[in-house]
Every structure is written in C-alpha cells, then in structure tokens.
Amino acid sequence: TGDCGACSVLVDGVLVCSCPVLGAEAQGKKIETVEGMSSGSELHPLQRKFIEHAALQCGFCTPGILVAAKALLAQNANPTETEVRYWLAGNLCRCTGYDKIIRAVMGAAAELRGAA
C-alpha cells in the first residue's frame, strides 16, 4: 500500500512509493532506485554519510530513505532540519529513532553544497 516508504523510487524524477504502482504505469519512464545512486565503487554522499553517522541498523527502510533524501536534495540543496524531517515523514524506521538519519542527510547536503 506504500505506507512505510521502503519502496520509494524516482519515476521521471518524482518520488513515489513503487509497491502500489503497476508495471504498465512505469512503462517508458525513467526509474531510479538506490542501486543507481553510487558511481561504480564510489558511494553517493548520502550513502557515505549514512555509514559515517550509523544511520541504519536493520536496513529495511534504508533504500527508500536514501532515494527520498536524494529527491529532497535535488529540489532543496540547503534544507533545514525541519524540512528534512517533514520530507522523510513518509519513510518509517523502527530502529534508529531518526536523529542519525537526519544528521546524515544534513551532512550530505552540506557536502554536496561544498560547505562540509
């Protein structure tokens, strides 16, 4: 039903929960998943910051949160903590309590802006 956000992907650059989307609806569209975030062996700054900040535990929610955070930073390179929390509200995590996730996203945003 798309309630937890773990299935988040970008469809033509728009963040969507993929589990309620039929394959026919995605035909001919650009689909971006967490697997496309890295460049070869070079991790995306969001992926690196998640590791640095220990922002994952079981990992179930991580792909969806990373894709959602990437979508946020594509629209807003300098989000406030409140904006990050609001943007990721559709992604549920039962392990981390979100603070480490928020710090990781804020750190990646700073790095991508060249402010880190």
Could you tell me what each predicted segment is?
Residues T1-A116:
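Signature of N-terminal electron-transfer/Fe-S-associated modules in redox systems
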